[in-house]
């Protein structure tokens, strides 16, 4: 795996030097991106574990979105809803990032009018942890097809395949999309599953 090939100490030391240089030259935006990138990789690599806590997953996505907000000149808003009862539950590492990236690239980036909103929710429902990503972007027709074939620029099939292998077909990703209104993606993880401690 790629994460096994990365020397994290070199990466973190390099980012620390870049951050120090940015602070020294009063480049706040560069410092902000560098810190977010450092947090993103720290939480993504997660000491080689395949499973991470919801809390760690959130830190990873917060760092990712910090970078995206800078890249997008803060042209979208992020709303969070996190049920504290699920924060220590385990979820597959890096499963959420492709879904969030999809919402930005294929939902909000193509929305031409009105406020752009990305909503992330983490809650318990029927004994499962539910992670929901919603955007008020353009929406799409036949969104469920994204789960069955490898479309260019869409990482949903890989995430869906991984969820089905880990938890079975009942835990396939669910997509609800309406053209012109936006898209909602739900990922369910059974609460009782504890694979790797983080």
Task: Show where each model-derived region lies.
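Two-component histidine phosphotransfer core
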Residues: 1-176, 182-188, 194
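Short, charged, solvent-exposed linker or helix-capping segments at domain edges/interfaces
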Residues: 196-198
């Amino acid at each position: 795996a790629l994460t096994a090939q990365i020397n994290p100490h070199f990466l973190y030391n390099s980012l620390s030097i870049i951050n120090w240089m940015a602070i020294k030259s009063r480049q706040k935006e560069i410092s902000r991106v560098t810190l977010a990138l450092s947090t993103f990789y720290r939480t993504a690599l997660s000491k080689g574990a395949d499973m991470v806590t919801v809390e760690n997953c959130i830190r990873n996505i917060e760092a990712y979105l910090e970078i995206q907000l800078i890249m997008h000149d803060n042209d979208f808003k992020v709303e969070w809803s996190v049920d504290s009862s699920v924060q220590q539950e385990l979820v597959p590492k890096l499963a959420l990032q492709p879904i969030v990236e999809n919402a930005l690239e294929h939902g909000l980036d193509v929305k031409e009018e009105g406020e752009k909103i990305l909503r992330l929710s983490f809650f318990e429902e029927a004994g499962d942890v539910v992670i929901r990503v919603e955007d008020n972007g353009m929406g799409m027709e036949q969104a469920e097809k994204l789960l069955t074939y490898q479309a260019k620029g869409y990482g949903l099939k890989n995430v869906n395949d991984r969820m089905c292998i880990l938890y079975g077909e009942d835990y396939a990703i669910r997509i609800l999309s309406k053209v012109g209104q936006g898209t909602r993606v739900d990922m369910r993880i059974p609460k009782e599953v504890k694979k790797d401690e983080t």
